[in-house]
């Protein structure tokens, strides 16, 4: 059988939702935040913003792999081209940053989402592997670090 990464339209949401569970929902639950309670509705805003953030920084990997992925994958770059896909990724990041500003008292996530914009824009053309493995993947580590740093200055 085919794995989830080989199913059209499933790879990007699966990655974004997995990272959101690991970086928002599980930590909130671990802290005892009952994210289903109305007074904690902001957690959903943060989670949705995180899904958009992860999706936005994942699209450049599909742009990089456009000539490697089978056409059945129907990734955004295969369907709409690199430029349109990166524009969509930038839009996702902008909405993500806005959501973090509205729903998250800690500005670390918003700061990293904003910092991701020029990096993602730069990937409209193929770059060296270090751009993907260090800069884009590093944004997830930077985001966690920024959350801790911004927590310490409040």
Residue ranges and their predicted role:
Residues 1-17, 73-86, 121-149:
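Interhelical loop and helix-boundary elements at the membrane-water interface
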Residues 51-93:
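Solvent-exposed interhelical
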Residues 12-27, 46-58:
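Alpha-helical transmembrane segments of multi-pass integral membrane proteins
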Residues 1, 21, 50-63, 118-125:
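Transmembrane alpha-helical segments that form the membrane-embedded catalytic/substrate-channel core
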Residues 19-20, 51, 94-97, 114, ...:
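Hydrophobic alpha-helical transmembrane segments of multipass integral membrane proteins
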Residues 1, 87-135:
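Transmembrane helix-loop-helix
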Residues 23-48, 98-107, 148-154:
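Helix-coil boundary and interhelical linker segments in multi-pass alpha-helical membrane proteins
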Residues 33-42, 82-92, 132-135:
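Hydrophobic alpha-helical transmembrane segments
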């Amino acid at each position: 059988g085919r794995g989830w990464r080989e199913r059209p339209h499933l790879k990007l949401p699966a990655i974004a939702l997995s990272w959101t569970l690991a970086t928002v929902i599980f930590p909130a639950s671990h802290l005892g935040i009952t994210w289903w309670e109305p007074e904690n509705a902001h957690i959903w805003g943060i989670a949705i913003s995180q899904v958009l953030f992860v999706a936005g920084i994942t699209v450049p990997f599909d742009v990089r792999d456009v000539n490697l992925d089978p056409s059945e994958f129907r990734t955004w770059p295969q369907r709409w081209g690199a430029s349109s896909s990166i524009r969509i990724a930038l839009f996702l990041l902008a909405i993500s940053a806005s959501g973090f500003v509205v729903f998250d008292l800690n500005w670390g996530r918003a700061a990293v989402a904003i910092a991701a914009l020029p990096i993602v824009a730069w990937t409209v053309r193929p770059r060296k592997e270090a751009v993907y493995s260090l800069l884009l993947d590093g944004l997830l580590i930077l985001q966690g670090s920024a959350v801790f740093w911004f927590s310490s200055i409040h």
